[in-house]
């Protein structure tokens, strides 16, 4: 698995499908190339101080490390958008939430391409 680092990649994934959870939102989008799964993490400033946002990001990264790769589809990009409740939510519950959110993403039809979210 690789990391998403470019803003354009994050924006492209934002136009894909999404699955909600109490502690995060998972966004996913298929890619045309044969590269590995790529994952990005983001937490907005409204979720607390820099220390709290970094802790949320660290918890999300650890979730993905402990997740079995079979839960994610090959040749896809994913973005986990952290919410404030990720600071206090039980880690096992968050792992279950991530698995079910990824499962819901697989069952959703692809969203309309080029949709503008302003």
Identify what each model region corresponds to:
Residues 1-118:
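Positively charged, solvent-exposed patches that mediate nucleic-acid binding
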